[in-house]
């Protein structure tokens, strides 16, 4: 819980500064890209969180990763990342990135959702599903799609903390439970 509260403070401060500059979405994309690069490379992660490495070494790694991000990074994000190095808080980077994105979405009236289907959905079906979910939630819904053949058919959508499950697998499981009770 302490880790999340520390990450939340950094995420909120970065969001406030990025919002004032009108660069919230750009910072969100860059922060996510930076965190993804670090998360996907165990050696980079080790350098950034291992106390055996000096601050200067960590700062050089952070600067190198910032330069490797296409288009560079916003000054506010660069300063925040340097601050995380100075305060030995780089271990919270993944949480900061997630919380920043969630807070930015909340401020913009957006919510992220995940749609899972047995086969890839056609664009028109996905657009119709997105519109239906927006009507249900009264918010702008950003959907990510996944394919899971084990669903057998139908669609499962999670928006925020709410799960809308219309998959055939779930319907079969419910029928099995009902039959066992009789």
Swiss-Prot record:
Name of a matching Pfam family: OSCP
Instruction: Give the top-rank taxon of the lineage listed in the UniProt record for this protein.
Output: Bacteria
Alphabetical list of NCBIfam families matching this protein:
ATP_synt_delta
What is the protein name for this chain? ATP synthase subunit delta
Report membrane topology: Peripheral membrane protein
Q: Which PANTHER family match?
A: ATP SYNTHASE DELTA CHAIN
Q: Which organism is it from?
A: Myxococcus xanthus (strain DK1622)
Q: MF terms per GO, please?
A: proton-transporting ATP synthase activity, rotational mechanism
Cellular component GO terms, alphabetical? plasma membrane; proton-transporting ATP synthase complex
């Amino acid at each position: 819980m302490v880790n999340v509260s520390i990450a939340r403070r950094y995420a909120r401060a970065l969001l406030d500064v990025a919002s004032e500059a009108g660069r919230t979405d750009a910072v969100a994309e860059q922060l996510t890209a930076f965190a993804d690069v670090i998360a996907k490379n165990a050696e980079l992660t080790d350098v950034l969180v291992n106390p055996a490495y000096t601050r200067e070494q960590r700062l050089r790694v952070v600067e190198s990763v910032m330069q490797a991000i296409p288009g560079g990074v916003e000054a506010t994000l660069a300063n925040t990342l340097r601050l995380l190095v100075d305060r030995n808080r780089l271990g919270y980077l993944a949480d900061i990135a997630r919380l920043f994105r969630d807070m930015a979405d909340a401020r913009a009236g957006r919510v992220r959702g995940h749609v899972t289907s047995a086969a890839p959905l056609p664009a028109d079906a996905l657009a119709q599903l997105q519109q239906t979910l927006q009507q249900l939630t009264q918010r702008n819904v950003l959907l990510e799609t996944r394919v899971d053949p084990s669903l057998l058919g139908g669609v499962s959508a999670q928006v925020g903390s709410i799960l809308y499950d219309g998959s055939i697998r779930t319907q079969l499981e419910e029928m099995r439970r009902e039959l066992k009770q009789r």
